[in-house]
Amino acid sequence: SMSSLMESKGYYVGVDVEESSIRVYNESLYYANIIGYTGKISAEEIQSLNTDSGENKYDTTDIVGKAGLEQYYEKELQGVDGKKTVYVNNLGKVLKEDSQVDPQTGDDIYLTLKTDWQKAGYQLLEQYVAGIVWSNTYDYKEFDNSQVGTNEIVIPVYDIYYALFENNVLSVSHLRSSEATELEKKVYNMFLDKKAQLFADLKAELISDSAKPYNELSKEMQAYITYLLDTTMTELGILREDAIDTTDSTYLAWTNDESISLRDYLTYAISKDWMDITQISTDTQFLDSDEIFSSLCDYLSEYVTDDNNFSKIVYRYMIENDQLSPQIECQLLYDQGILEPDDATYQGLGDGSVYSFDFIKDKIYNLEIKPASLGLSPCSGSMVITDPNNGKTLACISYPGYDNNRLANDMDEEYFSELVTDKSSPFYN
């Protein structure tokens, strides 16, 4: 216990017990967009805040506002650190206290917002947005909304099937984990087969003397190629972004006109030293272009196996091409614990007695799948309520919210990354 440690400090060299404070936000989901959060100060913030204050008030140990009111009222909320100078022996025992400066708390800020109104307004907003999604979802694979007015927007149910993977409702990493269920393992093996086929097709395209121009490839193949070039090969340093001449006619034919093949573009890139092929193989001196491209495909295929963003593209086209049925995808919502167990419905999805379209609409209607989770349009909203007698703001609501407790103090980096990439943009509503 803390008291026993304090009593035995002399026996534990370097061990001490200190009291510390952490920031805790009540009702975080409803207030996060207003209050923001705090975090450890950065070097840039130290320089900026010290310049603004005209003194060296901040150092590397400080916690400062990172967003919302916490950031806007940083100067008012930030107190003054206390200091104590002591002399200790080699066991850490205090021998003498030399000086002490007591800490000072910052100013308090009071809001006119009413928590009950915030919560009620948030729930109403969520229900309203869910109602729009529910009423505009149709049993279509695709629909051209450019031909209709804004009040006639259609959400094809397949957009929802895609969104379950694309917006991280379903975890692609869990499908390949050691804790995966039998159904998840089955789906992952389907993914591996699909990935093997797409890289075989890509390799065939790269070594073909009659390779198609980019604009004649399928949208699916274009999606894979775009990701592999713009993201994977650039991140790995295979495609040297800083070496590419963006005014080159061949580069423009690839990026703007889309009139040349991937084979022609990469062959040219190698000749211009835009590619570092030593990353693919250490013995490249005697390889011809076909062997280089074959090695490249094998290398990329292995590398992207654990790339969640690439996996999402593959799963999307598995669904679109009916290689992964919506029925199975809906069952995964139970396997991954997104939905509460329901054996009858799970079995019905498996034998076809429960139709995936009806299932999805029912889950949206009952808010078991929420608009923010899908990140489709619409997926957000806002509401402001004021007192007509005095103009005070009683509620200032933004949907969706987030848990700012997971960002304050010791930041949850994985959660922060999820928020940044979330298609419902919780940071910006």
Which functions belong to the PLM regions below?
Residues 1-428:
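Periplasmic/cell-envelope proteins involved in peptidoglycan metabolism and beta-lactam response
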